[in-house]
A protein has these predicted regions:
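Short, well-structured beta-strand segments within conserved domains
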Residues: 89-100
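N-terminal post-signal-peptidase region of extra-cytosolic proteins
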Residues: 75-82
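Short strand-turn-strand beta-turns centered on an Asx-Gly dipeptide
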Residues: 58-74
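Solenoid-repeat scaffolds in large eukaryotic assemblies
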Residues: 201-205
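Sec-dependent N-terminal signal peptides
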Residues: 5-14
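Beta-strand-rich interaction surfaces with strong enrichment in secreted/lumenal proteins
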Residues: 68-70, 82-87, 103
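Beta-strand-rich recognition domains
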Residues: 22-59, 99-196, 207-312
Length: 312
């Protein structure tokens, strides 16, 4: 009798474990695709950009009072930054640059250099259509060389075929008394997901931001599917580039509110620089050298909720 009970117990355990078999990446992506509404495709899909050249400074770029890009190393850089990610709909837009001295320097100095050009393309997929100039700016040397900080804002009109909610219906986070605890708790939960390489939970956590991201980038069904394949925690691009990915603990952090007070992120000190979000270290497969990186998360609290949600 006892042997029969043991056999039945072992059989039930086996059947349960089979029933709980881990989903494959293909299954996860198929199920995730079903939860995504593929954005409408338009005849004209305008895209806005800012091209920047800088040297011997640190700087931050904000679009509509939400950080879009940052350069904290002080070295020469020349990125082309797409802006649609912060453009919620047609109408007046604002871009702001905050410029700081390089490490251990009190003022911007005589070697500070910053140039930018703002432009757009009527249809970003058609590279034959020339870019359309909006404005240029160059850091005025004589007026700024002795300044410890410089900020400049510009407004421009954008026309896009979509309209998104974004952070327009988010709570004012300055009125949330336990904001730091909420952010740290959310970051720790995301750290656990990353450590466990739980792709399904990761996609679920970032789904609110992805839905709007795909809209403003005019993503096709194939592009969306490619995105999920690329960002799988088990078989995506990171796993092809890195070995021994280790999610690092949260240390020496501060809570950063975006200027609109609707978005928040966690920033960690990283030597003379900063890292936003969750840090990791890994071994580069190609040269076997150790490197570091990060997963950036911003949060908001939608109206009618008390819970933080990942946002663009």
């Amino acid at each position: 009798m006892m042997k029969k009970l043991i056999s039945l117990f072992l059989l039930s355990c086996f059947l349960f474990s089979c029933g709980q078999a881990q989903k494959t990446d293909k299954q996860i992506i198929q199920e995730t695709m079903q939860a995504i509404e593929v954005p409408k495709q338009y005849k004209q899909e305008p895209a806005y950009y800012v091209g920047i050249y800088s040297a011997n400074i640190k700087w931050e770029l904000f679009v509509n009072d939400v950080q879009m890009f940052a350069h904290y190393q002080g070295k020469i850089t020349s990125p082309i930054v797409p802006l649609n990610y912060r453009i919620l709909g047609s109408g007046k837009q604002k871009i702001t640059f905050r410029i700081y001295p390089p490490n251990e320097q009190a003022v911007l100095g005589k070697y500070a250099s910053f140039r930018m050009r703002l432009y757009y393309r009527k249809n970003f997929r058609d590279k034959e259509i020339p870019e359309i100039h909006i404005l240029n700016f160059e850091l005025p040397y004589e007026q700024t060389k002795d300044l410890p900080y410089f900020e400049k804002s510009f407004e421009f009109e954008a026309e896009v075929p979509y309209q998104m909610t974004g952070w327009t219906k988010s709570k004012d986070l300055t009125k949330v008394p336990d904001l730091e605890q909420k952010v740290v708790k959310k970051i720790e939960a995301l750290r656990t997901i990353l450590e466990n390489k739980d792709t399904e939970a990761y996609f679920q956590a970032v789904m609110p931001k992805l839905k709007e991201k795909f809209i403003c980038l005019y993503a096709t069904q194939q592009e969306i599917e490619n995105y999920f394949q690329e960002y799988s925690l088990t078989s995506g691009e990171f796993s092809k580039i890195f070995d021994d990915i280790q999610i690092l603990p949260i240390e020496d952090y501060q809570i950063i509110l975006e200027p609109n007070n609707r978005l928040v992120k966690l920033r960690q000190k990283n030597g003379d620089s900063f890292t936003d979000g969750i840090k990791f270290k890994a071994i580069v497969k190609e040269d076997k050298k150790e490197t570091t990186g990060n997963y950036l998360f911003r949060f908001h609290i939608p109206e009618g909720s008390d819970e933080l949600e990942v946002i663009r």
